[in-house]
């Protein structure tokens, strides 16, 4: 099911579909491992992304030009790289990545996220979640992290004592007291 005709048109442009009819054959997308959504495509709903079960790389710019307010990647368990670029007033308020345990690179900066659970993402190497509304961020299970960018949120504390591999940390512009 692909309810957004703009998303389906993008899939047609990529050769995964051939007519706008609200769906795409699973056989056409079951082996797709990379999907890069264009910035100015106008996609507002990515329902159907869950059927791209082989995806290891997904890039979605979200904002005025792609006004996506929710995204379900819980079925995309092969993802190792997920880039949700917040541009032009993104309204994305939540994202569940607890099922994406293979994730190594996750960028979700410049959205309206109020919480982010990365406790199941123990393979994370790079986490960029700056410019959100996060009040809490627990990275104690993410011991492989080499880069953590979480500035510009509402964090009052941040414990990186378990993150001994960190080579880059930017937590400026929060309300950190510990």
Write out the residue ranges for each language-model feature.
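Consensus positions within tandem repeat domains that build extended binding/scaffold surfaces
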Residues: 83, 105-107, 126-128, 147-149, ...
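Canonical leucine-rich repeat
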Residues: 46-49, 58, 71, 92-95, ...
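Consensus "Asn ladder" position of solenoid repeat domains
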Residues: 66, 87-90, 111, 132, ...
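Serine residues within intrinsically disordered or low-complexity segments
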Residues: 109-110, 115, 119, 140, ...
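Short hydrophobic transmembrane-like helices used for membrane targeting/insertion
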Residues: 68, 87, 95-97, 125
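Low-complexity/repetitive intrinsically disordered segments
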Residues: 160, 167-178
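N-terminal capping/linker segments that flank leucine-rich repeat
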Residues: 1-64, 68-77, 81, 99-101, ...
């Amino acid at each position: 099911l692909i309810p957004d005709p703009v998303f389906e048109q993008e899939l047609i442009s990529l050769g995964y579909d051939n007519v706008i009819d609200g769906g795409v054959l699973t056989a056409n997308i079951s082996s797709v491992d990379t999907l890069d959504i264009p910035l100015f495509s106008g996609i507002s709903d990515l329902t159907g992304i869950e059927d791209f079960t082989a995806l290891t790389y997904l890039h979605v710019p979200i904002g005025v030009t792609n006004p996506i307010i929710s995204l379900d990647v819980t079925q995309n368990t092969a993802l190792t790289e997920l880039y949700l670029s917040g541009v032009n007033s993104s309204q994305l308020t939540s994202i569940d990545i607890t099922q994406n345990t293979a994730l190594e690179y996750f960028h979700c900066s410049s959205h309206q996220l109020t919480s982010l659970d990365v406790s199941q993402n123990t393979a994370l190497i790079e986490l960029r979640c700056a410019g959100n509304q996060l009040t809490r961020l627990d990275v104690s299970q993410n011991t492989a992290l080499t880069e953590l960018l979480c500035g510009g949120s509402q964090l009052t504390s941040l414990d990186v004592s378990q993150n001994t591999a960190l080579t880059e940390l930017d937590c400026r512009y929060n309300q950190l007291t510990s």
